[in-house]
Regions:
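Non-catalytic structural connector segments
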Residues: 1, 5, 214-337, 411-412
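Flexible glycine/proline-rich, aromatic-decorated loop/lid segments
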Residues: 165-198, 354-369, 391
Length: 412
């Protein structure tokens, strides 16, 4: 049995031509039990890959095709520690590609399997990584005798891969066009070293055996290695910057205090008595203002605030609202939008500018008791303040708890 352990999708920018679903469908067609996604210097599509793989009943393997100015290797994740190490290594490569893979792996190789096909890379890695986790990669473009020579020299096993960039040989011209665009040149002038040949398509086990007829053990080793990789993926834990508050209860208390202080700015002084029948709700400057004799309107505001805070506290979302409040108050010109505008808590924190009571907006559209994922508040900042605000967030909460989310754009 064969498993593809070196597979690129459209998330390998200007390189891969196959979508995640197309790759998984092909794996099912070829009766593969596992599939590794190894994009070039990134894991942009991996969470979607895991989700889609479950639909196809395929075991998903995390990996990366690590390419620096000097080296080209495949990393595959054995366990959670390996996944974390791989993520940090990828970040290091994005800081600078002027680095050797051996230096990247020196203190972060635990929990990772490494496949390399170049002698100068293996020569360094064999000193760092045990032979149980380091392999010679036999891929298209590498001769069998060369791989066997390296395996003998360094006393390592060989693993065969397809180094996949497209589904079939017919897709290679599309790959070439992508590489040409990437290098801002022409189809006739593109350096051939920058373009994969037709050999780099998604092969069946039989086709791999035809390509490498004297390396059947290497083909079988791919399945053996796949079964050693991590496949039980659960992305449930959230690393959250909680403003140095000791616990969620303290965060909830601080949030309540801020919300009620903001409510008095939004609505006027809130009366603490029982509701009365006479409702006198006046609009002043497009906001609800509570008159001195209107405890009914005051009660409606308090009731809505308490209802929202109860759900927010129960779900453990108080730190989230405090962080958003902290970021928003760095400027006076923010506009909160989306379903977050249905929250009176957001309104009283001046995150949003729309009164949900006035427009009868339902909080459950934003957060409901059954929700398990974190809420999402979209905020627009002035373009000329955006960089300063981002710098503030990184400085306030630290590099280890702050990240920017990439936006993926694809060619049709």
């Amino acid at each position: 049995m064969f498993t593809s352990l070196n597979t690129h999708s459209i998330f390998s920018k200007m390189r891969g031509t196959a979508s995640l679903r197309e790759l998984l469908a092909q794996a099912v067609k070829y009766r593969m039990s596992h599939l590794a996604l190894t994009e070039v210097n990134g894991i942009w599509g991996f969470i979607r890959f895991v989700q889609f793989a479950r639909e196809f009943n395929i075991q998903s393997i995390a990996g990366v095709n690590l390419i620096t100015d000097y080296d080209d290797v495949i990393l595959l994740v054995e366990n959670q520690q390996g996944y974390e190490n791989m993520c940090r290594i990828i970040s290091d490569v994005h800081d600078s590609r002027d680095v050797h893979v051996a230096d990247l792996l020196k203190s972060r190789h635990d929990g990772l399997f490494v496949l390399a096909h170049e002698k100068h890379v293996l020569k360094k890695l064999v000193k760092l990584i045990p032979d149980t986790h380091l392999f010679v990669e036999l891929r298209p473009g590498v001769e069998e005798r060369t791989a066997k020579g390296l395996a003998k020299q360094f006393q390592l096993e060989i693993v065969a891969t397809g180094d996949v960039y497209f589904l079939s040989p017919e897709d290679q011209p599309a790959h070439k066009v992508l590489r040409t665009i990437e290098h801002n040149t022409t189809l006739t002038a593109i350096d051939s070293a920058e373009v994969k040949s037709e050999a780099h398509y998604f092969r069946t086990e039989k086709e791999m055996a035809t390509l490498f007829p004297n390396s059947l053990d290497a083909i079988n080793n791919a399945q053996y290695l796949a079964e050693r990789c991590k496949t039980d993926w659960q992305f449930l834990n959230t690393i959250f910057p909680n403003m140095d508050l000791k616990n969620t209860r303290e965060a909830s208390r601080k949030l309540r205090k801020l919300v009620y202080a903001g409510a008095e700015k939004r609505y006027g002084r809130l009366k603490m008595g029982n509701p009365i029948e006479n409702r006198d709700l006046r609009i002043v400057n497009s906001e609800h203002r509570i008159t001195n004799n209107n405890s009914s309107a005051s009660s409606a505001v308090k009731k809505r605030i308490n209802q929202e805070l109860a759900i927010i506290t129960e779900k453990g979302f108080a730190p989230y609202f405090l962080v958003v409040w902290d970021i928003v108050r760095q400027t006076n010109a923010t506009i909160g939008r989306g379903s977050g505008a249905a929250s009176i808590v957001s309104y009283c924190l001046f995150i949003t500018q729309v009164d949900p009571l006035k427009y009868n907006l339902q909080f459950e559209r934003f957060i409901h008791p059954e929700r398990v994922d974190m809420p999402d508040i979209d905020i627009d900042f002035p373009w000329d303040e955006r960089d300063d605000i981002i710098d503030y967030v990184f400085q306030k909460y630290g590099l280890h708890r702050t990240a920017m989310v990439s936006n993926q754009v694809f060619l049709q």
